[in-house]
Amino acid sequence: MAPRKLAAGNWKMNGDLAALSQIDAIVAGRETGCDVLICPPAVLLHPMVARIGGGDLLVGGQDCHHAGSGAHTGDIAAAQLADAGASHVILGHSERRADHGETDADVAAKARAAHDAGLIAIICVGETEAERDAGTTLDVIAAQLQGSIPDCATSANTVIAYEPVWAIGTGRTPDNAQIAEVHAMIRDALSATLPDVSLLYGGSVKAANATEIFAIDNVDGALVGGASLKAADFLPIVSALAAS
Ligand code: PGA
């Protein structure tokens, strides 16, 4: 089995019911040849699924709790995401790690809950700028992989997103050799346990750099923030992946 190609959009805390019109354009304009996923704020999940109708577009959550249900005000269980129509959930995004103090162990527990609910967990890893400058990128990422991936992970229920923290929302990206180096290390580290796992790159992916990034070995897709909010920005990225 070859890794599946996935173009994933992360709307973060952006969008409202009016923004769902973008979904019509994505469903109408998307090419086959890769999976396409949009992860909106949780309140938009169900209306987005309704809007997609029979269209070939996946939706996902941006986080879930590690428990199945209970007294956790403001949190969302993985089964509730699945019930709303989600197929995937992003876990351990650097914004969750920074804003909410999520540790690798938290991410692993959430991923276990996601798998129990039948969701595909997109587990995010990535170094800060200080870590890159200190030359510790590969060690940092190896440790995040080791700590954030639960034993129940398989190539089918897990996706790994390499997202250098300093490239997110900044317009800066690593050079191709830097992306290739990290993706090769991740592929190698997971070769025994998750041999066909999809490896996404994330951080300032846009139409102008997508083709170049998708040509890099072991890049099976992208996790896209800002450029996923508008169909006109996102569709060229989807096309570039489908053509890669
Ligand atoms: P960006 O965000 O594409 O806006 O840099 C990527 C991400 O955080 O997943």
Question: What role is predicted for each listed range?
Answer:
Residues M1-S244:
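Active-site loop-to-helix "anion-binding N-cap" substructures in soluble metabolic enzymes
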